[in-house]
Regions:
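ATP-binding/phosphotransfer module of carbohydrate and carboxylate kinases, centering on a glycine-rich
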Residues: 1-60, 80, 103-110, 153-282
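Anionic group-transfer/hydrolysis microenvironments
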Residues: 8, 15, 66, 97, ...
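Alpha-helical substrate-recognition element adjacent to the catalytic core
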Residues: 35-36, 64-72
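Short glycine-rich, polar/acidic loop-and-turn segments at beta strand-coil junctions
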Residues: 65-69, 96, 241-243
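Phosphate-binding/catalytic loop of phosphoryl-transfer enzymes
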Residues: 69-164
Length: 282
């Protein structure tokens, strides 16, 4: 029995596969070792009683997560998992590898993430190359949910939203500057808070304001995280993540302007990851 986990900063998808290739699916909060310590991760997993029923039977856990970018950070997640799945061999890898594996079709490609955060890599089937570091939601994360949420809140506080959107925002959220400051500067997980406004943004995706905002973010992402690769015009550029999927028309339009060839756009990579590991498991 194995478990494959794909975790962003907001949520984690878990798939348990038994010896007969039967699957069970679970969801937990997202785990990012930049923001979550071993205790938080362990307690969140233990809270899922249905998942933990199988903890002693699991022989391997393959975890791919946001922020799992160094041995030290990976160890935070690995220790928490080892406390739950006491008989399992545990591997922890970066979500970029999950992205690369989920979209790989046998040819080298650029793999990108547009979810709560954003990132990219070049994958040749063996090795991952990062040309530009991920700077996180304060300095970077162009085109991500946190990026757009920050833009929306900034324009709201500056009274720069179109009147219809401004009034709808006030009616739906009834929040003040103090509320926003508390959630972005004082409480943990500000990136998840910022990204939580993507549902509202999506509700107004036909408006000129949102169209321009999404297009600008996509352009910034493509310029900083795709066009940094010398051969970006010669390979497919694949995407995973809810933002790339929901706004795929905007993404394709902006990519066409730069002669970028978009390949796969996958909302959730977990199914492809499971298939990858089943092939190794059987």
């Amino acid at each position: 029995m194995i478990i494959v986990v794909e975790s962003g900063s907001t949520k984690s998808d878990w798939v348990l596969v038994n010896d007969d290739n039967e699957q069970k699916r679970f969801k937990t909060m997202g785990f990012n070792p930049f923001f979550h310590n071993e205790t938080i991760i362990y307690n969140a997993i233990k809270y899922n009683n249905e998942l933990c029923k199988f903890s002693k039977e699991v022989k391997a856990v393959h975890f791919y997560g946001a922020g799992c970018s160094s041995e030290e950070l990976n160890l935070v997640v690995k220790k928490a998992l080892a406390k739950v799945f006491i008989n399992a061999e545990i591997t922890v890898d970066h979500d970029l590898l999950a992205c690369a594996l989920a979209t790989y079709d046998g040819s080298p490609s650029i793999s990108c993430i547009l979810g709560t955060g954003s990132n990219s890599c070049y994958y040749d089937g063996n090795d991952i190359t990062e040309n530009v570091p991920a700077l996180g939601y304060i300095l970077g994360d162009e085109g991500s949910g946190a990026y757009y949420g920050k833009k929306l809140l900034t324009d709201f506080l500056y009274n720069k939203l179109p009147n219809e959107i401004q009034q709808d925002f006030i009616q739906k959220f009834n929040i003040t500057k103090a509320d926003i400051f508390e959630n972005t500067y004082m409480k943990p997980h500000a990136n998840v808070y910022l990204a939580s406004f993507m549902r509202f943004i999506s509700d107004h995706k036909e408006s000129e304001y949102v169209t321009n905002m999404i297009n600008d973010g996509m352009n910034h992402f493509l310029q900083n995280h795709v066009m940094c690769y010398v051969n970006y015009k010669d390979v497919k550029v694949n995407f995973i993540g809810s933002i790339s999927y929901i706004f795929r028309d905007n993404l394709n339009n902006q990519a066409n302007k730069h002669n970028i060839d978009i390949g796969e756009i996958i909302k959730q990579p977990i199914d492809n990851l499971v298939n990858h590991h089943i092939k190794s498991f059987v």
